[in-house]
């Protein structure tokens, strides 16, 4: 079982195209249902943010899964796959795992080191768990990626400035408008990014804050935390006329602020209105750029500014940590790979002991039950002690050199049947789900991953080229 990642991101994809490819929550859920409901994908999750749309799938075969994902992106997205094919990145097996590690750590973000993406990865995985699509393999990979991200954040200064996209955007606005302290601000949206925006605006010293959202309850809860006011989105035209700075981040698939509404709002203004649109797709119609006294900053504006936000030393340190964590992940995966053979060995030993005890019972019927039970206990204890050290050691060695050679050695030495079923728990088909039932151990129990399939079918260069370019994480 190998991990396959197919997606588009801010790296190499025009934002005008990326904003059309972004999936809303309903689209992502439906795509996930069809993905894991297919016979070619066992586990999966969908990560859709303002920076990327990526499908993560645990698969046996590369080519059928790649074809399926391409079809699903066209079926559930807002863009035909042919339009984005030249921008698609494809990662497989170890490269796919390394890519997820980099994404979770913020090293593949538009703002290097930003930590909102950790929550986005966690949310994507949680949805997969809730729908029964996160089994042992995906669980191990995601938990190791989140652990690696925590190490990067704790051991480097890659996000020491605490900057977010909003912080950088407000800096650009202040360069064009002048200091933002003392100005009135309007935040459109009430989700996680809106909360980040409100905090950033508070730090720069705005004096009047209004949060507008379709869900007034959420807007009120957010505004009250910062002594602001809440308003319904229906009052947007009036709110725009009364504010100096707007930060919009709704996640709507259609523009929230159109040129006609803003034309009325800025009529007669003498001071410019600053707009920071960090939504993808755009919340604010780009046509507003032609209006007088309107200064708009969006993700396209931010992209070149964000390229050099983290120091090269911090990035190198972070990548070194990710390399260490990836090596540890591979070692754990390899150690688990020898477990079926170890279980088969212990199972054979138990069957041999049981047969010999039955033979002894027939040959010495004069033994009373107490004596026979003492013999049984002693024999089991001897066998357990003989097997304990080598089976523990073989798992340690497999973690260093891979499971295949040690598994083969055990099977040869003890004449184990490689096809013999062993008692290892695994995700089972769910009667109420088209995919595998969820496997939900604790978040830190990331060592139950199945063995890495070194003989899994590798992606051909032609297939990767057909789907897009294969990029390094």
From Swiss-Prot:
**A single Gene Ontology molecular function, please?**
NADP binding
At which residues is there a site annotated Important for activity?
A: 99
Q: Which PROSITE patterns match?
A: GLUTR (PS00747)
Pathway annotation from the record: Porphyrin-containing compound metabolism; protoporphyrin-IX biosynthesis; 5-aminolevulinate from L-glutamyl-tRNA(Glu): step 1/2
Reaction equation(s) it catalyzes: (S)-4-amino-5-oxopentanoate + tRNA(Glu) + NADP(+) = L-glutamyl-tRNA(Glu) + NADPH + H(+)
What EC number is given for this enzyme? 1.2.1.70
Q: What class of enzyme is it?
A: oxidoreductase
A GO BP annotation: protoporphyrinogen IX biosynthetic process from glutamate
User: Active site at which residues?
Assistant: 50
* One of the Pfam families matching this protein, by short name: GlutR_N
Q: What else is known?
A: During catalysis, the active site Cys acts as a nucleophile attacking the alpha-carbonyl group of tRNA-bound glutamate with the formation of a thioester intermediate between enzyme and glutamate, and the concomitant release of tRNA(Glu). The thioester intermediate is finally reduced by direct hydride transfer from NADPH, to form the product GSA.
The record's PANTHER family line, in alphabetical order, gives: GLUTAMYL-TRNA REDUCTASE
Q: Give the protein family.
A: Belongs to the glutamyl-tRNA reductase family.
Q: Describe the protein's quaternary organization and the partners it interacts with.
A: Homodimer.
Note what the entry says on domains. Possesses an unusual extended V-shaped dimeric structure with each monomer consisting of three distinct domains arranged along a curved 'spinal' alpha-helix. The N-terminal catalytic domain specifically recognizes the glutamate moiety of the substrate. The second domain is the NADPH-binding domain, and the third C-terminal domain is responsible for dimerization.
Name listed for the protein in its UniProt record: Glutamyl-tRNA reductase
Q: Which organism is it from?
A: Acidothermus cellulolyticus (strain ATCC 43068 / DSM 8971 / 11B)
Classification from the root reads: Bacteria, Bacillati, Actinomycetota, Actinomycetes, Acidothermales
């Amino acid at each position: 079982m190998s991990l396959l990642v197919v997606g588009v991101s801010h790296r190499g994809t025009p934002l005008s195209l990326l904003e059309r490819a972004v999936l809303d929550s309903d689209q992502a859920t439906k795509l996930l249902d069809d993905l894991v409901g297919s016979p070619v994908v066992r586990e999966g999750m969908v990560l859709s943010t303002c920076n990327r749309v990526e499908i993560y799938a645990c698969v046996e075969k590369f080519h059928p899964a790649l074809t399926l994902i391409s079809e699903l992106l066209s079926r559930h997205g807002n863009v035909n796959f042919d339009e984005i094919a030249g921008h698609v990145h494809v990662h497989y097996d170890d490269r796919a795992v390394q890519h997820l590690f980099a994404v979770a750590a913020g090293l593949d973000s538009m703002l290097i080191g930003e930590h909102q993406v950790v929550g986005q990865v966690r949310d994507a995985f949680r949805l997969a768990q809730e729908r029964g699509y996160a089994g042992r393999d995906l669980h191990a990979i995601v938990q190791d990626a989140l652990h690696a991200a925590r190490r990067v954040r704790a051991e480097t200064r890659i996000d020491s400035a605490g900057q977010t996209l909003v912080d950088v955007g407000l800096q650009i606005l202040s360069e064009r408008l002048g200091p933002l302290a003392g100005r009135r601000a309007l935040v459109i949206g009430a989700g996680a990014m809106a909360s980040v925006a409100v905090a950033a605006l508070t730090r720069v010293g705005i004096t009047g804050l209004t949060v507008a959202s379709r869900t007034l309850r959420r807007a009120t809860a957010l505004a009250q935390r910062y002594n602001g006011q809440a308003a319904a989105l229906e009052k947007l035209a009036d709110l725009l006329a009364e504010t100096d700075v707007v930060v919009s981040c709704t996640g709507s698939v259609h523009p929230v602020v159109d040129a006609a509404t803003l034309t009325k709002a800025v009529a007669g203004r003498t001071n410019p209105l600053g707009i920071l649109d960090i939504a993808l797709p755009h919340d604010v119609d780009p046509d507003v750029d032609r209006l007088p006294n309107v200064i708009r900053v969006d993700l396209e504006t931010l992209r070149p500014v964000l390229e050099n936000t983290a120091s090269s030393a911090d990035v190198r340190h972070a990548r070194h940590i990710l390399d260490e964590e990836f090596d540890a992940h591979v070692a754990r995966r390899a150690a688990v790979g020898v477990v079926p053979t170890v279980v088969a060995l212990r199972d054979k030993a138990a069957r041999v002991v049981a047969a010999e005890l039955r033979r002894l019972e027939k040959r010495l019927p004069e033994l009373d039950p107490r004596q026979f039970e003492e013999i049984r206990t002693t024999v089991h204890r001897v066998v357990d002690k003989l097997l304990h050290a080598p089976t523990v050691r073989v798992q340690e060695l497999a973690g260093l050199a891979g499971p295949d050679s040690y598994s083969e050695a055990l099977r040869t030495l003890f004449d184990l049947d490689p096809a013999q079923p062993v008692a290892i728990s695994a995700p089972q088909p769910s009667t109420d789900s088209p995919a595998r039932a969820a496997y939900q151990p604790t978040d830190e129990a990331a060592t139950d991953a199945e063995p890495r399939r070194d003989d899994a079918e590798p992606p051909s260069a032609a297939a990767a080229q057909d789907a897009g370019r294969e990029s390094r994480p």
